[in-house]
Amino acid sequence: MRPSDGPGITVVGIAKEFESLVDCLYNCGDYDMQATIIETLLRYTTRSVRHKMASAWFPNYVKLQSLFLGIKDFESDCRTFLGHFNEGLSDKKQVWSYPMMFCTVEGRSLVKPEDLAEFWVDFNFGPGTVSFYYVFKVNNTTETICI
């Protein structure tokens, strides 16, 4: 996934829809939904629009704005951004993410995706799930287990 660099959508007229997405980012309580929202914001805005809107979307948190604007390698950079984002929510936090040393399901060891620095497990209080990504060795694709 690459952020949009083309003409994209202007801020005028669509800003409210993006604000609704950002509100959902703060309240959905689900890592996968949060990652999808970030991907949407990156795909449907130009770099210049993101620079203009980052301070409105993530007010009073310059590091978070910088992490958002610095997303290049989506999987790892988004994971870093959302880790800081969720930690910053303190008592309103609904997603807890922790690195795992290993994961075994029904006696089978699962393999960490190569594009992630660590093997993460997400506790999502919005939908009440636990999820993690792993590599499915049969076809070498990244899959998600959601409990």
Where are these regions (language model features)?
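N-terminal recruitment modules of adaptor/scaffold proteins
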Residues: 65-147
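Positions within ordered alpha-helical repeat solenoids
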Residues: 2, 23, 27, 43-47, ...
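Alpha-helical solenoid scaffolds in eukaryotic proteins
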Residues: 15-24, 40, 59-65
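Helix N-cap and loop-to-helix transition residues
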Residues: 3-4, 30, 146
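Elongated alpha-helical scaffolds that mediate protein-protein interactions in large eukaryotic proteins
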Residues: 1-18, 34, 44-58
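Short coil/turn segments at helix-helix junctions and helix-capping linkers
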Residues: 24-33, 69
